Amino acid sequence: MRIGLFGGSFDPIHLGHLLAASQAQEVLCLDRVLFVVAARPPHKVPVAPAEARYEMTLLAVAEDPRFTVSRLELDRPGPSYTVDTLRKARRLFPQDELFFITGADAYRDVLTWKEGERLPEYATLVAVARPGYPLEEAPLPVVPLFVPEVGISSTEIRRRLKEGRSVRYWVPRAVEVYIEKHGLYR
């Protein structure tokens, strides 16, 4: 099988993430895409708790059989290092072809990650192209994934929510309801 591991904070997950996952699944002929929610990313501090981000991601992908949500990082103590996640995934899926998918902005600093230079040993690296982050400058070989630009970011969604503005059509409706119910990002 060909499995995509889509890593991110998903703080919150939004339609841009889902579009990127769908594009990755189609372009790379993936049998499935596992959303890997970062529990404790070492390079940034999430706003919402890990379990809330996990639950929102579950809600976001519930109706798409191509997508599942993984607890690979959530059930492991300590910081969420990508190399540890990929090692664990390689043990879980020893015969499968793995693709690690994340934004081009993240790959810019991949060599500062714990054992970042070793990531290609465990999975093919796939970078979702973003304006301002040329993939030619990526420090490790990556497969570029071009996704239509939607101009949606988790940062902008959190800002809008803090200002009391709507995020309808920015996130799946179930995620919007979850955010409202739990008073997140206020």
From Swiss-Prot:
Source species, domain of life: Bacteria
Entries under InterPro entries matching the protein: Cyt_trans-like (IPR004821), NadD/NMNAT (IPR005248), Rossmann-like_a/b/a_fold (IPR014729)
This enzyme's EC code(s): 2.7.7.18
Transmembrane segments: none
Record SUPFAM superfamilies: Nucleotidylyl transferase (SSF52374)
Reactions listed under catalytic activity: nicotinate beta-D-ribonucleotide + ATP + H(+) = deamido-NAD(+) + diphosphate
Biological processes annotated in GO: NAD biosynthetic process
Function in brief: Catalyzes the reversible adenylation of nicotinate mononucleotide (NaMN) to nicotinic acid adenine dinucleotide (NaAD).
Name of the protein in question: Probable nicotinate-nucleotide adenylyltransferase
Gene: nadD
